[in-house]
């Protein structure tokens, strides 16, 4: 089925909005009469991985649960579109067995053999292309590419002589060493200034492109401490970063994974749902919560799990008012305004290509990520807020940015993308914090507010902003509700 989300361009059709996805849910609701179908034990707002995990856990535990989702699909900021037999990851892609929460679910759903590697250096050009200006390129082997980035990242992270292990020994407890707060408050640019004399020109260009790929922001507004947190979660090594961040994906796309959560919850017979249902306001007390949708429909439950992303929370009216700490974080928002563009290109040898075009190009980092059924190469390309592009507003500019990654080597047969910056239900891509934001706001964002549990990957303790972090948070939220409402009697009886 086709979602309203996403864009596709081909030379024959031009730009069209809406792409097919396994995540589209039809019919869009199984609720005919809110009074008849209620009352609900729990309402979950948001059908991303956090909301899906909470919904699955609560329905399996015996609770009558209502899922409200603004979109026409599940997955939130992590979903895929299958076009002509090939999955394009619109947001969220890579997973790894070092990400314990997501791997628990992969084994639960017997999908351990459903992964494929993004990189394939077995044929084709088999090189890395570094472009620091529009007219020249430096080519090197992938081994040299690894050494270049490894050297640069080790210099960047080595604030303590141990590549961050001393100042951040427990990544899930970031401020176990109080000194770490100063790194949370430090920007990328401030850290680069400290090591500028140690970096070669190629190291600096590659480093800046890579870390901006991670944050989606600018050198000035991205927290160095947040990158150190990613680094620590990856095992404090360059290879760990590459393995955990950009190496392994689902053969059939993220939405195939999300469907497993959905189908298990629906199979309990305790799931109600309404898609295309943006929320306008939430009124909550200690033992009840009432949600009003934009169209005026009202829903009530004993507890509410709110999984709305940080950059969207300010669009919802909460009564009683939220804490000043949470409001401050909502008003500031995270910095990630990443652009992610998929390009199907007619050069099959680009499958083993990787490249950086920075700082001049609006897409700064790309890799050969697969081969389509037509025999073309799939490139996944990223841009950041440092040199931003709105890919749907000027396709010619987008095509130019793709072409500038490796000029004269391919023709573009298809573009596929989701504009996360203009998406009213995301207002940006994955979470990445401003300097000082985590130390100031993380705890406040995680606090319960009367009958409402706030849960989202944006404030996870571990793989924050990742699918793993979303599952971590959904698990936590469901556990809070279970502890407060107790185990349902009918489930205990079956046990």
Curated annotation (Swiss-Prot):
Keyword Oxidoreductase: yes
InterPro entries associated with the record: Amino_oxidase, FAD/NAD-bd_sf, Flavin_amine_oxidase, Flavin_MAO
Positions occupied by motif Microbody targeting signal: 493-495
UniProt main location, coarse: other
Database matches in Pfam families: Amino_oxidase
Sorted UniProt keywords: FAD, Flavoprotein, Oxidoreductase, Peroxisome
GO molecular function, one term: monoamine oxidase activity
Name of protein: Monoamine oxidase N
């Amino acid at each position: 089925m086709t979602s309203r989300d996403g864009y596709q361009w081909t030379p024959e059709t031009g730009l069209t909005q809406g792409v097919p996805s396994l995540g589209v849910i039809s019919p869009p609701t199984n609720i005919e009469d809110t009074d008849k179908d209620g009352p609900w034990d729990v309402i979950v707002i948001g059908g991303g991985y956090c909301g899906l995990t909470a919904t699955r856990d609560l329905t399996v535990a015996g609770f009558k649960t209502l899922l409200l989702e603004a979109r026409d699909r599940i997955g939130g900021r992590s979903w895929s579109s299958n076009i002509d037999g090939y999955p394009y990851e619109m947001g969220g892609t890579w997973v790894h067995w070092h990400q314990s929460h997501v791997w628990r679910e992969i084994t639960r759903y017997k999908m351990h053999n459903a992964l494929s590697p993004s990189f394939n250096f077995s044929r084709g050009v088999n090189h890395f292309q570094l472009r620091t200006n529009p007219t020249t390129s430096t080519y090197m082997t992938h081994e040299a590419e690894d050494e270049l980035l490894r050297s640069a990242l080790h210099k960047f992270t080595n604030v303590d002589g141990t590549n961050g292990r001393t100042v951040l020994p427990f990544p899930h407890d970031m401020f176990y060493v109080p000194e770490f707060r100063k790194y949370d408050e430090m920007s990328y640019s401030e850290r680069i200034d400290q090591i500028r004399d140690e970096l070669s020109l190629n190291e600096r260009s590659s480093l800046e492109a890579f870390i901006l790929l991670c944050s989606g922001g600018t050198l000035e507004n991205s927290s160095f401490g947040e990158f150190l947190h990613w680094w620590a979660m990856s095992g404090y090594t360059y290879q760990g970063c590459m393995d955990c961040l950009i190496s392994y994906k689902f053969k059939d796309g993220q939405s195939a994974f999300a469907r497993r959560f959905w189908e298990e919850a629906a199979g309990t017979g305790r799931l109600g749902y309404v898609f295309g249902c943006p929320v306008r306001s939430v009124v909550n007390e200690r033992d009840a919560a009432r949600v009003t949708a934009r169209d005026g429909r009202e829903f009530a439950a004993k507890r509410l799990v709110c999984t709305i992303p940080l950059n969207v929370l300010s669009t919802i009216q909460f009564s009683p008012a939220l804490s000043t700490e949470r409001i401050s974080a909502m008003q500031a928002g995270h910095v990630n305004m990443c652009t992610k563009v998929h390009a199907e290109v007619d050069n099959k040898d680009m499958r083993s290509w990787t490249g950086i075009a920075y700082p001049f190009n609006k897409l700064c980092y790309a890799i050969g990520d697969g081969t389509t059924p037509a025999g073309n190469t799939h490139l996944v390309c990223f841009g950041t807020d440092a040199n931003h592009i709105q890919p749907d507003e000027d396709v010619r500019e987008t095509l130019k940015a793709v072409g500038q990654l490796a000029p004269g080597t391919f023709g573009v047969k298809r573009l596929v993308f989701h504009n996360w910056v203009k998406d009213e239900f995301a207002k940006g891509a994955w979470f990445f914090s401003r300097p000082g934001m985590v130390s100031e706001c993380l705890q406040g964002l995680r606090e319960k507010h009367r009958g409402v549990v706030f849960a989202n990957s944006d404030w996870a303790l571990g793989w924050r902003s990742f699918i793993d972090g979303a599952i971590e948070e959904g698990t936590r939220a469901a556990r809070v509700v279970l502890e407060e409402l107790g185990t349902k009697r009918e489930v205990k009886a079956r046990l």
